Amino acid sequence: MILGAVFYIVFIALFFGIAVGIIFAIKSIKLI
């Protein structure tokens, strides 16, 4: 159960990080 919770948190953090990275990349491209 604890392992599942940790995996869920890591998955959300990864997904959030990728989403923020994509948004940041799009903003950088628009600035250029």
Swiss-Prot record:
One of its GO terms (biological process) is photosynthesis. GO terms for molecular function: electron transporter, transferring electrons within cytochrome b6/f complex of photosystem II activity. The keyword Electron transport applies. It is found in: Cellular thylakoid membrane. Its main location: membrane. Component of the cytochrome b6-f complex, which mediates electron transfer between photosystem II (PSII) and photosystem I (PSI), cyclic electron flow around PSI, and state transitions. PetL is important for photoautotrophic growth as well as for electron transfer efficiency and stability of the cytochrome b6-f complex. The 4 large subunits of the cytochrome b6-f complex are cytochrome b6, subunit IV (17 kDa polypeptide, PetD), cytochrome f and the Rieske protein, while the 4 small subunits are PetG, PetL, PetM and PetN. The complex functions as a dimer. This is Cytochrome b6-f complex subunit 6. It comes from Mastigocladus laminosus (Fischerella sp.). The lineage of its organism: Bacteria, Bacillati, Cyanobacteriota, Cyanophyceae, Nostocales.
